[in-house]
Amino acid sequence: MATARTAERHGPLTGVRVVELAGIGPGPFAAMLLADLGADVVRVDRPGGAALGIDPARDLTNRNKRSVVVDLKSPDGPARVLGLAERADILIEGYRPGVAERLGVGPETCHARNPRLVYGRMTGWGQDGPLAPRAGHDIAYIAVTGTLGMIGDPDGPPAVPANLLGDYAGGSLYLVVGVLAALHHARATGTGQVVDAAIVDGTAHLSTMIHGMLAAGGWQDRRGSNLLDGGCPYYGTYETADGRYMAVGALEPRFYAEFLTLLGLEDHADTRTDVTRWGELREAVAARFKSRTRDEWTAVFEGSDACVAPVLSLREAPHHPHLAARSTFTDHAGLTQPAPAPRFSATPTAVRTGPARPGADTAAVARDWDLPALLQDENPHRKACQ
């Protein structure tokens, strides 16, 4: 595992200014991605901190950012944010539709100050539609897109994939793609725009290939009945003798043949395409994996093309030899964390700073962004009472 260091070049987005109106989930992660790529991300924290109550020193989604504290409900709070928006390339907010407008920092108000601004809106349901004003979380968003119903054992309830599928894959990544595409347009035309990134849209979009297979008759619309959803005995997970698991993805004929050879099940070579015998094959594979521990099977498949890997825990993953060799994880200030991704040959990225502490960077941002109003106390009475 590598140790984070400050690179001479901070990434391909060096020079891009981003304002993040503090929230939870996909918005902060999207802003972290931009910060990892070198953007100067200023997080506007609210007094009292975020609702999740995570120790700010360990909130890794705030790494590589700077923080100021602004009370948007104070008389001069909106003006301070508008001052930042006037100097920014991108603004990200994750409020319910209409909230930013009521706070005085909606897109029309921001664009009046900065017509080139890319205004990114991150929500679950989107800016319009019957559910737009309703509360929700990742699990509800992915439920209505059909993607949650694809995951899990056919004889049990849908499996909950943490909040990676909806919040981050269907949300954060699409917001980042959207604001960067809009930034490209703004720099070419001088005109900014609003990016409506909805988790329901992004998650549905992720299933495009599956919908094509469904239309072609190559996908059954029931969980655990298909090649890639656990229905196939040579694409799934198997328990080992020590209660751990191995992941198998031996789809292609030559990978399948090597898989069977290393398992000692060569007599099942003709079972690969015979769906009627998949149950028999699954039982045979499961029995073989139960005969040894996970680490023993890892050694058996080491160096092969059988497409088999151990299922690791979060704490185990940084120590995997391949990930360690690539420095997939890094350490900064004693916190082990995934390193920025992807990688760039000419503009390398790095974990430059740890999680931003609320309000700790106000003076530096006021100086660098030429916004001295940030240094003025919003509520002198509150300060006197402290």
State what each model feature region is.
Residues 125-126, 199-204, 242-244, 250-255, ...:
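Glycine-rich beta-alpha junction loops
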Residues 1-178, 182-191, 353-357, 361-386:
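N-terminal helix-loop segment corresponding to the beta1-alpha1 unit
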Residues 229, 234-304, 308, 375-377, ...:
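Aromatic-enriched alpha-helical interface/lid elements that frame and gate functional surfaces
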Residues 2, 7-9, 51-58, 314-360:
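Active-site-adjacent capping/gating segments
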Residues 192-200:
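Beta-strand segments within the central parallel beta-sheet cores of soluble alpha/beta enzyme folds
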Residues 149-163, 218-233:
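Glycine-/small-residue-rich "gating" segment that lines the acyl/pantetheine channel
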